[in-house]
Amino acid sequence: MGSGNWIVDNLNSALEMWNGRLAEIWQLISTTPEEFKGGGVWNVIVNINGALQAIGYALLVLFFVMGVVKTCGSFTEMKKPEVAFKCFIRFVLAQAAVSWGMELMTGAFRVAQGMVTTIMDSSGLTAMSATTLPDELVSVIEDVGFIDSIPLWAVTLLGSLFIWVLSLVMILTVYSRFFKLYIATAIAPIPLASFAGQPSSSIGVAFLKSYAAICLEGCVIVLACVIFSAFASSPPAIADDTLAAATIVWNYVGELIFNMLVLVGAIKMSDRIIRELMGLG
């Protein structure tokens, strides 16, 4: 409900947008790809994965032949039992990876999701702490006359614009994680087929590392939200109420946006953080 003051209502509207996106992230991060958007997207991805398995089997043979040609100097070497057995085992394991790739990837995601749930439970947070305007700041704004409130309009518009942009960047980053999961799952049979040949196996290793990093991004996002929640529980203080109203509001909004930038930056760089910490780059 509006307070009757345009400046206060504008700031509250921006903070409601921010709080709404935080609540959505908290819900999304605990959602599995099968449950996302009712599971309709996941069903399409499963069908694409199944269709690409046929191509994966064809590439399996191609990568296997290429691997044999490059690793074996001659046909005589291929006749050696240990070499033939090694190539056979590699082909069987690669075929199993293509056939059971969906189960392998969903299992890896469940492990990462279990870590996310553990972090959520350990933090003691059932929901994100809402960011609200302090009553002291509202009183300062409401006591300002019409002429003196003109600078406040510019400060409020600029601050609200920053908050809206940060909210959109933050939620788009979390949604992009789901899209990366879907894309990786859909094309999985292609890179997994590369395990059939030793020279091409680096493609499959890079793919699995990238998928593991995507799954573990959720841990960084949750940790960033938990840390920001601690910041939000102690909002920026009004240091000196004798300053001009525009200065007080600017100082408050500036510190608030800085805290928001820390959260958005951590979420935006979650993939890079995981790759550096876990060596998955």
What are these regions (language model features)?
Residues 192-209, 273-279:
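Alpha-helical transmembrane segments
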Residues 59-95, 187-201:
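Hydrophobic transmembrane alpha-helix segments characteristic of membrane transport
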Residues 1-59:
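Binding/recognition "hotspot" determinant
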Residues 48-55, 91-95, 172, 182, ...:
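Loop-to-transmembrane-helix entry motif
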Residues 94-187, 225-278:
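Non-cytosolic segments of integral membrane proteins
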Residues 54-66, 158, 163, 181:
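Hydrophobic alpha-helical transmembrane segments
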Residues 5, 39-50, 75-87, 148, ...:
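Membrane-helix interfacial "entry" motifs
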Residues 1-11, 81-101, 204-215, 270:
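Alpha-helical transmembrane segments and their helix-start/interface "positive-inside/aromatic belt" motifs
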